[in-house]
Curated annotation (Swiss-Prot):
It comes from Brucella melitensis biotype 1 (strain ATCC 23456 / CCUG 17765 / NCTC 10094 / 16M). Residues 78-269 form the ABC transmembrane type-1 domain. The keyword Transport applies. The complex is composed of two ATP-binding proteins (UgpC), two transmembrane proteins (UgpA and UgpE) and a solute-binding protein (UgpB). GO terms for cellular component: plasma membrane. This is sn-glycerol-3-phosphate transport system permease protein UgpE.
Length: 282
């Protein structure tokens, strides 16, 4: 039985509350700023209570305000980010799942060599890989395309490693039973591995969706057309102006709208996400 210590519980709750405040306050501050005019935002001290221009700012930003600043509508920026994040998350999961499946359940020469070659890519800094990858994308004519934005980011050594470690815990008796039932590789993967892996897939999807949504450097390199910009690039372009000329009200509105999709993904998949991280039973 765990001994209840009121003082320890109080300290623990205070630390949690402090952590929540530290994380949530910048979001609240951004929301408050999104309800003010640009002049009010740059004139300190800014109020901690919402202003009178909340509906006006959001309406103007969504219906043309952002487009006048960066040359592309807010809806298009959000759509581009959604396409990129979904394609990267789904692509990474499919490729990593298939790679780990082949490495664990097939016996072929140098299979561990190929696994370690995949794993070693984790040691390479992004800056080392990004220039040759960019050259390939240019040569293939994939600048300003969704394929150029997503394909180079679909390979994932981390996800392959995590799936491999999970597959290694599959009982050998289960594999033998599938063989006795004449289950081929595809049927074994579809009927056994996929159901067992659903919580792991959900946890990885949350992580990889956020990874894809927050991409900045790669979209910055492979997009010249403003219509292919993601929401992160759009935000950066909005604050390229002089401080006094930056439409800070639109910036704050865009920032709030930019964090809503990742938050929704985390909230909607929270149960699966936590279960996928802690579940060990097969």
């Amino acid at each position: 039985m765990i001994e209840q210590r009121p003082v320890s519980n109080l300290i623990g709750h205070l630390i949690l509350i402090l952590g929540i405040i530290i994380v949530a306050f910048p979001i609240y501050y951004t929301f408050v700023a999104s309800s003010m005019t640009s002049t009010q935002i740059i004139r300190p001290p800014i109020s901690l209570l919402p202003g009178d221009h909340l509906v006006e700012n959001y309406r103007e930003a969504i219906f043309g305000g952002v487009e006048r600043v960066v040359g592309v509508s807010l809806e298009r920026l959000l759509w581009n980010s959604f396409v990129v994040a979904m394609a990267i998350a789904v692509g990474k999961i499919i490729i990593s799942f298939m790679s780990a499946f082949a490495i664990v359940f097939f016996r072929f020469p140098m299979r561990m060599f190929f696994f370690w070659m995949i794993f070693i890519t984790l040691m390479l800094p992004v800056e080392v890989r990004i220039l040759p990858t960019y050259k390939v994308i240019v040569d293939l004519g994939m600048i300003d395309t969704y394929a150029g934005l997503t394909l180079p980011l679909m390979a994932s050594a981390t996800a392959t490693f995590l799936f491999r470690q999970f597959f290694l815990t599959i009982p050998g008796e289960l594999v033998e039973a599938a063989r006795i039932d004449n289950a081929g590789p595809f049927r074994f993967m579809r009927d056994i591995l996929l159901p067992l892996s659903k919580t792991n897939i959900a946890a990885l999807f949350v992580i990889l969706f956020i990874y894809g949504w927050t991409q900045y450097l790669w979209p910055l390199l492979v997009t010249n057309d403003a219509k292919m910009n993601t929401i992160i690039i759009g935000l950066r372009r909005m604050v390229d102006w002089a401080d006094a000329s930056t439409p800070w009200n639109y910036v704050m509105v865009t920032a709030i709208l930019a964090i809503i999709p990742p938050i929704l993904v985390v909230v909607l998949m929270q149960r699966w996400f936590v279960k996928g991280l802690v579940e060990t039973e097969k």
